[in-house]
Amino acid sequence: MPRHRSGPAPSAARHSVRVPATTRGRVLAGLGMAAAVVFFLTTVPFHRNWFDLHVYYGAVEHWTGGDPIYDYLRPGTHYGFTYPPFAALCMLPMTLVDWHSALAVSQLMNVAAAAVILHVCLDSVIRRESRHRWFAYTAAACMLALLEPVRDTVSFGQVNLLLLALVLADCRLLTAGRARFPSLGRLAGLGIGLAAAIKLTPAIFICYLLITRRWRAAGVAIGTASGATLLAAWAAPTASRTFWTEAMWNTDRVGSLAYVSNQSWQGMLARLTEPFAEPSRAVWAVGVVLLLWLWARRARQAVAAGDELAGFALTGAAACLVSPVTWVHHLVWLIPALAVLADKGLRADPGGRRRRRLLTWALVSYAVLCSSMVWLWRWNDGGAPGFLGANAYVWMALFLLLLLPLGEPGADRGGPYAQSGPYAQSGPSATMGLCAHATASPSPSVPVSWLSEQPASPTRPGSKPAPSGSAG
């Protein structure tokens, strides 16, 4: 099948960011960007010293030595293994190598996961916007590495990038997979199921498949998650019983809910009431119900508009908000939303207000998520301004859930990510982007309400401390 392009070939006359004209210049610029990022990452005073990877490594060694895995605590702390038993089975190979080898493999897996994330989020926009794909990917990789959730995931030795890559692989299969690789398209849901079996948070993406009527993919995801969980129950019955009946419900294992790193709705409530009282469970529950209602409504709109990446982005934002514990490194789930913002801005009418607003919002959101600003109020003592600043990432996730633009009026519907789901009869193809180095290809624009827009006439058929925290 021939490969389609979304819009005309990029034009040098429309580039909004100049790139070096020669190959040598681009190579030098790419090396310069990479060197600057490496220098920053090796000197910034927020490295987490592989804390969570130490927990994983120590826990599986403790387990293979004959002791209960959920009894393990890292020496000098009260933090232990908090993941389901299937995750422990996946980590067993670490016991075959020494610590430094395990660390090296962990970082290589993070690099591979980042490559998948960049490809799913950026491939179509880079094809549309840039003549120099490798240079655009280099710049995007440098930008990705500077995000605080990515920095924390890497320096904690966390698994969040791997989980996001698994989930986004299903996003790709739900769009391009079915059109270009039908046999692979039938595997959609496999990545979400594996991610949900490793960690509970990605299970919300199974709900996303259900509310958007992707029955086959939802069945694959549920079957995969259930099969992995049953495999763990067969291989480690005692650990499975302990996790599902005790460890999962013990919130003391993950740290203080009021700690500033907990950037969830529950964390915000806990900081609001600390130290005078516990946050109201009723208020938390009402907020969660409202957030889930809003998410379900907007996710259906995204799929009706053929905008699969936006649907996944909304689900990631909702996951960050409704989870009782959303440490800063969990906020990698907001990366697809940044991609959608940038791509929609680049597609908007050049010189128009909507373009400026969307690109400004994307840049401000990116800067905030790089800034580590919440740590300025880590002791929750800044009054009203401190409350606003300490919850900066909560506000960001909420704004993205409320206002993320959906669909693309006038976009080419035959591109590499064309939607083939239940709402594919109307709405433009999904477009993906996080950063680009040129203005968008011209496309018709329609009046919209500030930033967000409704899909076009869809036709539907029928506490975790900074240097040391829980391995959560």
Question: What would you call each of these model-derived segments?
Answer:
Residues 342-417, 430-438, 447-453, 469-472:
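Aromatic-enriched
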Residues 192-209, 323-330:
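Transmembrane helices and adjacent periplasmic/lumenal helix-loop junctions
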Residues 2-186, 212-328, 344, 385, ...:
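Primarily membrane-embedded glycan-assembly and transfer machineries that use lipid-linked glycans
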